[in-house]
């Protein structure tokens, strides 16, 4: 059964990318353009081939959350979102 989230809600999700220098700026640009002030942390894989980003922010609606997730998944090098 799908958990019903009441918005606004603080949501945390993780994204994984192939290593690239432009990902930090692209994620920040997506969040800022939509008025989201959140926390973004980055961790490098052991061999340095991948970057994982943990994003925590308050989202006003599921539509906004889906819009941001869609935009982030369109960044070059995107592998998955959890």
Predicted regions located by residue number:
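Long, contiguous binding/interaction regions
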Residues: 1-52, 56-82
């Amino acid at each position: 059964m799908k958990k019903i989230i009441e918005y606004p809600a603080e949501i945390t999700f993780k994204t994984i990318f192939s290593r690239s220098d432009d990902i930090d700026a692209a994620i920040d640009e997506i969040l800022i353009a939509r008025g989201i002030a959140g926390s973004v942390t980055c961790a490098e894989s052991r061999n340095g081939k991948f970057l994982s980003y943990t994003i925590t922010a308050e989202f006003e609606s599921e539509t906004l959350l889906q819009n941001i997730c869609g935009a982030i998944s369109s960044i070059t090098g995107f592998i998955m979102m959890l």
